């Protein structure tokens, strides 16, 4: 049988829980991987890459995990009978190349593709073999991805080890007949940065998993690299804090990386694969390219000589020894001149020791923190070097390539934080970034040309399992998750990890978990910035009550689901669902009950003591849950992994201090506005009705909308503090002249009924994204009825105190005065000016707005 597939048939496919192509029942032409207690052999060529051997043996172990039957893994096909899994890399596997030469396999469409593969049934592939299951890769990672794709289709989660996900037991494994091509990926280099490992991964590896090394060593990295392949990732920036010895301190680390076909890089602060914190042994002041150019260059050169024959991405440029500004130059002009000389010298080293055609060597320049300002001031980066845009450390990308920049040969990438240690406040404990925010930002970056390198800072990796996978799924296939199917991600994830029976409810629990924590992360339950005196939260009494009630209900749902899990899945459920939900719920109970106790300390001491006792109980429960994580689940496998409030003396200004009951001086709260009179609304009116002097609108509940030339406002489900959000798509849409908005701009329309006329303050709550054009602000316009649109510019300047509060509050606001000409029905219109603006909520204060954190509840009559 000749297998033929065309290039057009190479989708970036991925296994979906809802689309299994491995079943327990026979089907016409199906391949029996396991049937009746017998497993097909797995065959690969000894001449193939090491990662092929690793993945083939992992597949055998995975099949055994599911069926109890372990296939034989062999490197020759002599004596094969019946059926076999045939694994190989084009041009490296005599086994696979023999199939091609004999006409059994046509791989013309696979040749020359990056990390692509096909999984196909093939009749009579070898003498004695009546049916083969061929896994053919275009390169070494393509082959490995194919093997692990089959493992996932069989029923083994990529997180079987890192999150202890137990597969469903099965008797037979029958692969449906046909060819399934995959690749190439949407983003060329896709990976993670292990960071801030001091309080989780490093002590766990050093004292629990790899005590023979006493550090994050080859055994730990082998597990990380295996996970990367199972997630179709290919790049790792290794741990680099002072508590961890440098990656290259252990010679076996780079060998293991190459065995697993992982591309090694280094962070924005570590040029040329050097870990400065552990490897720069000269006085710190000598890490200065102005005064010690030769010494620094020799330091870089030694690493290139040692590692240049492995597959790497080389970070160019120079910052301080750790995450700090470059030493030496005194002005930005000098810094630019020095950095451009650094580029020249670093590329000369790469040309000398890696490849004379230096443009073929993967290189990146990360415009992180202060370095982005230098780029904006004119820093010239070599054309073939990939420029990495950073987020602002809180998930909002700071810069986007212009159409002219997108012509660069080196392309662009993104360095994105799912975990962070730094100003204004760290978030290292729980993973709480909504998948919808990751989707909104990364799809926007991709649309603006960031398609070469994506790296996520995942902290200790645990407990960022969900975010890590979603980020990497997007990088593999940008078309897999879209606005119209975003909510399905959590359902598919829960189905794979815990079975279809509870998947919908688990997904609903996690969706609510992300929404509540988007309002305020559990690590950010303080409302003052470092160096400021403590002050109360911005929530009013109703918001506190509702928040605590919602967390209590969510924790009860998670607890009930935990009890319904089969024993084999309870530990995994605890890690992925129960602990995060309980932890965040208890942290909120602890903080807000403590805050309420502080408020009541003078007026009602008995009530204050009761609330304080409840806060202390929540604190003890939280410690108990963390002890369970570290000491009890999976027999203590994760001992020392989970810490409640990780920080060290170096970062005390960016942390929440060890928890204690808040001590506030009670101050009189602002008096609530008296209820406003209201009148009758005519029958049949559908829209938003002024209530107690306020019109409050969730942005996604527009009455109607007008699209223009393929540009439209669209809902992003799951992104927003109290609902969904709305943004303009495509995000590459050109900005519009304010004078032409009425005729040219896409708009949203909201029918509203007012019981008063006049000029009223309008506040529009936005997701705190950065503008697509640096320095412009987030621009949109509003109008009532046929009035001229008023342009609003929301601009919490990057790095300012307003920005800090914006990312902690998950909102930035734009305001204006809204002229309501008469009592009655009006149409509030919102016009696009620039793409990249994400609307969350709209509030008109007709005189009744009371203080609060989330804005007043929606005031709709019907919709």
Q: Residue spans of the language-model regions?
A:
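Contiguous, structured surface segment used for ligand recognition
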Residues: 14-184, 756
